[in-house]
Amino acid sequence: MSIVTKSIVNADAEARYLSPGELDRIKSFVLSGQRRLRIAQILTDNRERIVKQGGQQLFQKRPDVVSPGGNAYGEEMTATCLRDLDYYLRLVTYGIVAGDVTPIEEIGLVGVKEMYNSLGTPISGVAEGVKCMKSVACSLLAGEDSAEAGFYFDYTLGAMQ
């Protein structure tokens, strides 16, 4: 739930107007909107690079994934793995734009561990791929922008633990 929605819900539950502190937090959130949109745009514009390089890093760190018997062995399965990484990058951009983890949670993380377990895919490999993408993505950003994006990658990784 965004800070705007959360503040309104809390104030309404208490039948009161928004407090000066709540209004200041909302103002700060609104003012940071341009920065969040810029970060999401950079990640979106570089999505192919982030996914490709993140995948390459994953396959170097975890050669078992692309070896015979591995979950990303063969051209088709490698493409499926990269498709999944792209999906998690997209979720991260949703969180950045919203300034909140709710879209990540509600759209893509509910049941993620169970899904991969049912497919026989080790969640640790998926998480490692997301970590690798975080490294690539954050290298494209500086300072606060990198920290902002990193937060949403870390949230996604936390749900995979």
UniProtKB/Swiss-Prot annotation:
Q: Which UniProt keywords apply?
A: Antenna complex, Bile pigment, Chloroplast, Chromophore, Electron transport, Membrane, Methylation, Photosynthesis, Phycobilisome, Plastid, Thylakoid, Transport
Query: Got a GO cellular component term for this one?
Result: phycobilisome
Q: Where does (2R,3E)-phycocyanobilin bind?
A: C81, R83, D84
- What positions are modified (N4-methylasparagine)? N71
Q: Which GO terms describe its biological process?
A: photosynthesis
- How is it placed in the membrane, per its record? Peripheral membrane protein
- Spell out the post-translational modification annotation for this entry: Contains one covalently linked phycocyanobilin chromophore.
The places in or outside the cell where this protein is found are:
Plastid, Chloroplast thylakoid membrane
Query: What the protein does?
Result: Light-harvesting photosynthetic tetrapyrrole chromophore-protein from the phycobiliprotein complex.
Describe its partners and assembly state.
Heterododecamer of 6 alpha and 6 beta chains. The basic functional unit of phycobiliproteins is a ring-shaped hexamer formed from two back-to-back trimers contacting via the alpha chain subunits. The trimers are composed of alpha/beta subunit heterodimers arranged around a three-fold axis of symmetry. The phycoerythrins also contain a gamma subunit which is located in the center of the hexamer.
Add the further remark from the entry: The light-harvesting antenna system in red algae and cyanobacteria is formed of phycobilisomes. These are composed of the phycobiliproteins phycoerythrin (CPE), phycocyanin (CPC) and allophycocyanin (APC). Cyanobacteria also contain phycoerythrocyanin (PCC). The phycobiliproteins all share the same subunit composition and organization with variations in the covalently bound open-chain tetrapyrrole chromophores.
Question: What is the recorded name of this protein?
Answer: Allophycocyanin alpha chain
Organism in which the protein naturally occurs: Pyropia yezoensis
Give the encoding gene's name: apcA
